[in-house]
Curated annotation (Swiss-Prot):
Protein origin, superkingdom: Eukaryota
UniProt lineage: Eukaryota, Viridiplantae, Streptophyta, Embryophyta, Marchantiophyta
Subcellular location per the Swiss-Prot or TrEMBL entry: Plastid, Chloroplast
NCBIfam families in UniProt: rpsB_bact
Organism annotation: Marchantia polymorpha (Common liverwort)
Keywords of the record: Chloroplast, Plastid, Ribonucleoprotein, Ribosomal protein
Database matches in Gene3D superfamilies: Glucose-6-phosphate isomerase like protein, domain 1 (3.40.50.10490), Helix hairpin bin (1.10.287.610)
Family annotation (InterPro entries): Ribosomal_uS2, Ribosomal_uS2_bac/mit/plastid, Ribosomal_uS2_CS, Ribosomal_uS2_flav_dom_sf
Keyword Ribosomal protein tagged: yes
Gene Ontology MF annotations: structural constituent of ribosome
Name recorded for this polypeptide: Small ribosomal subunit protein uS2c
UniProt-listed SUPFAM superfamilies: Ribosomal protein S2
GO annotation, biological process: translation
GO CC terms: chloroplast; small ribosomal subunit
């Protein structure tokens, strides 16, 4: 698939606050190549670098989705949870937006067992089986179902390990990144000025705290995924 510009405009990134990094004293020196300047104690991200890596990420996901590859989007910070869900649903991706359960990828066989239990409980609820049980037992099963829906609902239809994982906050999702590294699963990760860009395959230098910044980056990535799928159908 030939490279595209993906309509990545510096003005839009500035409006979304993509360029605002963390306090300079909290920086990771490995982010130096991606920092433009320091202003009032805050590092300012070089948006030319953001555009370069975001474009590379969009090329990768568009090409992968055109070949039927599966994606997992991970972001459990409270200000991003709803954005993760809506973006994933729009692009028909799997997602984790509440809590990363240790071993979600590295102990996939156990997660598969829990997903099967989740589906069984859902089926019992739909058929009314749960409501025919003794009150205490029914309440217990409903609690289990709510818990599984909250933490595994976004990967309910994931039947194997994902081909690419998109991660919103490197610091918060450190365990997820480590699992991807262990399994050799490629990652695309938003990296703020306090992150380590060497831990991910495609680092996208960006503000990983502001909703507008997260939304803007996710929108570009999910549009690229959708375009890749559309092109595979068209061809």
């Amino acid at each position: 698939m030939k490279q595209k510009s993906w309509n990545i405009h510096l003005e839009e990134m500035m409006e979304a606050g993509v360029h605002f990094g963390h306090q300079a004293r909290k920086w990771n020196p490995k982010m130096a190549p991606y920092i433009f300047t320091e202003r009032k104690g805050i590092h300012i991200i070089n948006l030319t670098q953001t555009a370069r890596f975001l474009s590379e990420a969009c090329d990768l996901v568009a090409n992968a989705s055109s070949k039927g590859k599966q994606f997992l989007i991970v972001g459990t910070k409270y200000q991003a949870a709803d954005l993760i869900e809506s973006s994933a649903l729009k692009a028909r991706c799997h997602y984790v937006n509440q809590k990363w359960l240790g071993g979600m990828l590295t102990n996939w066989s156990t997660i598969e067992t829990r997903l099967q239990k989740f589906k069984d409980l859902e089926n019992k609820k739909k058929t009314g089986t749960i409501n025919r049980l003794p009150k205490k037992e029914a309440a217990n099963l409903k609690r289990q179902l709510d818990h599984l829906q909250k933490y595994l609902g976004g990967i309910k239809y994931m039947t194997s390990l994902p081909d690419i994982v998109i991660i919103i906050d490197q610091q918060k999702e450190f365990t997820a990144i480590q699992e991807c590294i262990t399994l050799g699963i490629p990652t695309i990760c938003l990296v703020d000025t306090d992150c380590d860009p060497d831990m991910t395959d495609i680092p996208i230098p960006a503000n990983d705290d502001a909703r507008a910044s997260i939304r803007w980056i996710l929108n570009k990535l999910t549009l690229a995924i959708c375009e890749g799928r559309y092109n595979s159908i068209k061809n």
